[in-house]
A protein has these predicted regions:
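Contiguous, non-catalytic segments that form substrate-binding/exosite surfaces or channel walls
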Residues: 1-14, 212, 219
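Short pre-active-site segment immediately N-terminal to the catalytic Zn-binding motif
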Residues: 8-30
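Short beta-alpha connecting loops at secondary-structure transitions
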Residues: 14-18, 46-55, 86-92, 112, ...
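Short, glycine-/Ser/Thr-/acidic-enriched flexible segments
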Residues: 20-24, 34-35, 69-70, 167, ...
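Internal glycine-rich alpha/beta core junctions
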Residues: 27-37, 56-57, 61, 68, ...
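C-terminal, non-catalytic "cap/extension" segments appended to globular domains
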Residues: 29, 37, 75-77, 98-101, ...
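Post-HExxH zinc-binding segment in Zn-dependent metallohydrolases
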Residues: 42, 52-82, 89-92, 96, ...
C-alpha cells in the first residue's frame, strides 16, 4: 500500500505516505487524515482501555473526507473539461468504494464455498470480474491475478465495510452539520445501535439510496 495511518493513545497519530503531490496522492492523504483526526479526537474523549474504533466504522471518516474533496473539486472548477474530469473521478471513487468492494466480498464468499487451490483461485476471481463488468468488457487473462495485490483480503471480510462506510459517509455528508458527533464512537460501543442515534441506519435501504441517487446525478451531468 502507498499509505498507512498508525494511532497511539495520548500521542498524535502518524501517517506514512509516499506523497508526490499528485491529485491521487491528495485523495490518499485526506483519506488517511480522516483516520488520523478521528483517532486524535477519540484520544481526548476516552480512557486508554476504551480507545479505538470499531472495525465496522473505521472507514467512515476516511471516505467522508474523499467525498468532501470530490465535492470541492466539482464545485470549484470553471472549465467544462475540468468539471468533467472531476466528475469522472468522483464516479470512480463510488465505483471503487462500492462496486469494486462488492466484487471483492463476493470473491471471498466464493472462496469459502469452494475447495481452493492455486489453479482455481484466479479462475473464480475472473468469473466474478466478468459477471460485474458484463459482456461489453473483454478482460485480459491477467485479471485473474489481481486478487494477489488486494491487502484487504488479509483481513477476513473487511472489504464490504467500505460499502457500508461509504454509504454512511454520503448520508452524513448530506446532513453534516447535525452529524458531527457521530465520529466520536469508542471501540466498546455497539456500532450499529450507536449510529442509529444519529439517524445513520445501516439496515435501511434509504441510506444507500442517497448514495445511488448521487451516482445517478453525477452520471446525468456527464451524458
Amino acid at each position: 500500500d502507498s499509505s498507512l495511518q498508525v494511532d497511539f493513545f495520548d500521542v498524535h497519530p502518524y501517517i506514512l505516505i509516499n506523497y508526490q503531490g499528485t491529485e491521487s496522492d491528495l485523495y490518499t492523504l485526506v483519506h488517511e487524515l480522516g483516520h488520523a483526526v478521528q483517532s486524535y479526537m477519540l484520544s481526548d474523549k476516552y480512557e486508554y482501555w476504551e480507545f479505538g474504533v470499531p472495525e465496522f466504522l473505521v472507514e467512515i471518516p476516511s471516505t467522508l473526507n474523499e467525498i468532501l474533496l470530490s465535492e470541492y473539486f466539482i464545485n470549484s472548477v470553471s472549465e467544462e473539461s475540468e468539471y468533467m474530469n472531476s466528475t469522472f473521478k468522483y464516479l470512480d471513487k463510488i465505483k471503487t468504494n462500492v462496486f469494486k468492494q462488492a466484487q471483492i466480498t463476493l470473491f471471498e464468499l466464493k472462496l469459502y464455498d469452494n475447495e481452493i487451490d492455486t489453479n482455481n483461485i484466479g479462475t473464480i476471481y475472473k468469473e466474478i470480474n466478468d459477471l460485474f463488468y458484463g459482456e461489453t468488457v473483454n478482460s485480459d487473462q491477467l485479471i485473474s491475478y489481481e486478487w494477489c495485490r488486494l491487502s484487504s483480503l488479509y483481513m477476513n471480510f473487511y472489504a464490504y465495510q467500505y460499502i457500508t462506510s461509504f454509504g454512511a459517509a454520503m448520508y452524513i455528508f448530506n446532513s453534516l452539520n447535525s452529524k458531527k458527533e457521530a465520529l466520536f464512537i469508542g471501540k466498546y460501543d455497539d456500532p450499529i445501535e450507536y449510529m442509529r442515534e444519529y439517524d445513520v441506519d445501516f439496515e435501511s435501504k434509504s441510506m444507500y439510496n442517497i448514495l445511488f441517487d448521487k451516482m445517478n446525478q453525477l452520471l446525468l451531468t456527464v451524458k
